[in-house]
Amino acid sequence: MPHLPLASFRPPFWGLRHSRGLPRFHSVSTQSEPHGSPISRRNREAKQKRLREKQATLEAEIAGESKSPAESIKAWRPKELVLYEIPTKPGEKKDVSGPLPPAYSPRYVEAAWYPWWVREGFFKPEYQARLPQATGETFSMCIPPPNVTGSLHIGHALTVAIQDALVRWHRMRGDQVLWVPGSDHAGIATQAVVEKQLWKERGVRRHELSREAFLREVWQWKEAKGGEICEQLRALGASLDWDRECFTMDVGSSVAVTEAFVRLYKAGLLYRNHQLVNWSCALRSAISDIEVENRPLPGHTQLRLPGCPTPVSFGLLFSVAFPVDGEPDAEVVVGTTRPETLPGDVAVAVHPDDSRYTHLHGRQLRHPLMGQPLPLITDYAVQPHVGTGAVKVTPAHSPADAEMGARHGLSPLNVIAEDGTMTSLCGDWLQGLHRFVAREKIMSVLSEWGLFRGLQNHPMVLPICSRSGDVIEYLLKNQWFVRCQEMGARAAKAVESGALELSPSFHQKNWQHWFSHIGDWCVSRQLWWGHQIPAYLVVEDHAQGEEDCWVVGRSEAEAREVAAELTGRPGAELTLERDPDVLDTWFSSALFPFSALGWPQETPDLARFYPLSLLETGSDLLLFWVGRMVMLGTQLTGQLPFSKVLLHPMVRDRQGRKMSKSLGNVLDPRDIISGVEMQVLQEKLRSGNLDPAELAIVAAAQKKDFPHGIPECGTDALRFTLCSHGVQAGDLHLSVSEVQSCRHFCNKIWNALRFILNALGEKFVPQPAEELSPSSPMDAWILSRLALAAQECERGFLTRELSLVTHALHHFWLHNLCDVYLEAVKPVLWHSPRPLGPPQVLFSCADLGLRLLAPLMPFLAEELWQRLPPRPGCPPAPSISVAPYPSACSLEHWRQPELERRFSRVQEVVQVLRALRATYQLTKARPRVLLQSSEPGDQGLFEAFLEPLGTLGYCGAVGLLPPGAAAPSGWAQAPLSDTAQVYMELQGLVDPQIQLPLLAARRYKLQKQLDSLTARTPSEGEAGTQRQQKLSSLQLELSKLDKAASHLRQLMDEPPAPGSPEL
């Protein structure tokens, strides 16, 4: 709505202050000095000086003299630390008798609380059973046991933040909670790290040590890293029951693993067989599917691999001619990405309907290297439109070829050894060569013999060992396998029937697909670190071709009894050799939900807390860990190990990249919590196990991502930020600046409590919450918002969507309590006599608000809650961690949705008032305000909130102008709606001669932005609505400036100067 013309304004309002019919003002505590006083003159002179300086700055920006963004970025430096320095023994309660420090300091807040929580037993279900709010219900979870290969990363912190928030909420609402801590021995990963460390520090290979000596080294590593992981979990505030801590290689776990193996074997679900497995030549062990990284290559790519002196080329298709036997000029050209496996070829296959090869069906080809005849076979698995339509068949080194070979009765030839060198079957000229060195030699010979037909780029997926970086080979090995079809079908049916709930539900599709295509699980690993397989070979002479005799037992004595039964010979006469291999780490991990509770013994914990109430973990572990827990748990205990699964997304950096050591973007939670400078980050890299080439790349990437280091953010800010990302969304893109912003939120809460404690005073006695009744509309509004926050938190926890909880808490603390109520109540608290209602409301907001916050920010909530005075009549809880969580129903009597709806109208007025002040640069003046509305109900609403309107709008007196009354002269006007206006006093508060050039400079700047946006071609992916919103916002701001300039010229009571720009 345009401003009214000059003629519509009345004379300066204060000249008619006592005239009949003029509005009455509700005065507030802030009043300006009379305009003629010396103080007023000095204030105006100072204000004019500031405005001149601001004008010069704007003009410099227009002239292009402003600093570039890079110049304005400051490096982070640790601030002066505020530390808790009162002598307190570990486990003693923190001394909170002193005043709160002036600013929030994470190190001060987080000191001393955790040891006290543990010593008091707050995290034990036995303690929780005695709480006044005890429900008699149980809630049990186990932490996904982190690998002892190193320290926790940000993905672990996300798991802890989500699980601990849920656990603390259940504990506060009165459930008996058991959250079991533990760590995983991580067989391949740990052995690889220790081997790398031994070589780096002492130049020793594993095979140069005895098995016992090497295992001592690994146990030393475990003790060091296991302790470090526990300290990290404590630093994150994880409320685990440490008396029940377990490790997947401790005695109890070993008993459970052996029992599970024996039971599965007796049930016919475990067998030994000779078949293809994923083989890491660098580790000399079979590995699980989860340890295989399927890396897509767009075409020719060179990779550095362990044991290779030079980079190896991949993403190439080599064409090789196989001569037709008996026809010197006939050949079949085969394309392959693995020419090093040519010595293992036993046939060439074509599609039976491919007319190009119909005349060769049943014919023999000649091996291009060995010269022996090879059959040309037909198989429907061949894709005739890929390459030449002819493929070589290598059953010993390809799963697809192994299936084809089995269909056609072809015997495999193993031409690659366990260490990645060529076997004797390749001939003397290749035996012992590294397979990729042999590749070059093979291609050279084929070229020399005229059988090489070309080379071309070929997109492919290359299987890489995630532990060693080596290319995976498929080798035929004698291994132990678990039959998964029957157990997998039960797991699939559990989800389909609803007995097992996966959340988010879109994971159900992957679950069903995986279990409908599941193969048998190879559980043998050629390692020293892990659970040695409880299977024994009966050593005896037998005829060529007879199978070995293997027996399984919980001990050698039991195995000997079984062997005696099988052979019919006395057990004492038999020689048994235990399988040196160990079990896949995922085997023991799959038992964790019940082995951690004492299975196979019938323990009280197993009876009370199994099945678990919830399994929460990363979505990347759905199939490899969750699926296997469901299979083995159902098979071994007769029931699902849990009925609900909550899966959180992967944590990625702000650019959307997976966090990886090789990219240098891994975030250590400790660095975010305590802060770290760049040189320290770089030193941590140098002290790790990266090789020099990797180190240089990673260090450069780290400098780019964190050029000024990482600022100190604190545990509570990190936890809150991680929980604020919804599990229903895609991957979590985390930036340090986001956590730092949450630290500022912590500071807001800190300052709010400092204000509230100061306002309450030492003699304040809180009322019981149920007796508190609001004494003003503002009190009623904030209590209603508090009740709404409790309702939203309860909904978020019940649905396990923690982003709803964080949003509700952030909105209440920041936008309702700090930004509105505390500001509005400040002048009220200094009234004389002091009203009784607001202090009680402030206390309830602090007490209940902190309890709502406690599951997500346990340290900050405890520190501040301990300083609140106790409510009379009942003993307070010793800790906020065991205080009752505010329930929505207990606060329902405070809910007033209609008041909240109407108060949003008041907030609209406040926004208009602040916008007017900003437009006219009224930085310190407190102008008077008039509100005019013909909307029914507005008059009564505004009258009820006159004082808060003046306080929140940074204005002086606020009055009501009757509908239809003439607008005052010399006042700025802004529309509130089609039926309501806001008027603000300007006469004597604004100097038009100073303000007009400032407005012109601001308009010039905005116009440049608008012109640039209009002329720019929309970028790919830029939403049309987003672009239109930017355009509309700039146009609106320009319109406001034009109206303000027009009104300032009217105040000057003279026409625009010739040649001045029209605004």
Curated annotation (Swiss-Prot):
Q: Which GO terms describe its molecular function?
A: aminoacyl-tRNA deacylase activity; ATP binding; valine-tRNA ligase activity
Extract the ranges annotated as region (Disordered): 25-53
Q: What GO biological process terms are annotated to this protein in UniProt? A: valyl-tRNA aminoacylation
According to the UniProt entry, what is the EC number of this protein? 6.1.1.9
Q: Which Pfam families does the protein's record reference?
A: Anticodon_1, tRNA-synt_1
Record flagged with keyword Nucleotide-binding: yes
Superkingdom: Eukaryota
Binding sites annotated in the UniProt record for ATP? K661
Disease (UniProt):
Combined oxidative phosphorylation deficiency 20: A disorder due to mitochondrial respiratory chain complex defects. Clinical features are variable and include muscle weakness with hypotonia, central neurological disease with progressive external ophthalmoplegia, ptosis and ataxia, delayed psychomotor development, cardiomyopathy, abnormal liver function, facial dysmorphism, microcephaly and epilepsy.
Similarity remark: Belongs to the class-I aminoacyl-tRNA synthetase family.
Q: What is this protein called?
A: Valine--tRNA ligase, mitochondrial
| Species in which this protein is naturally found | Homo sapiens (Human)
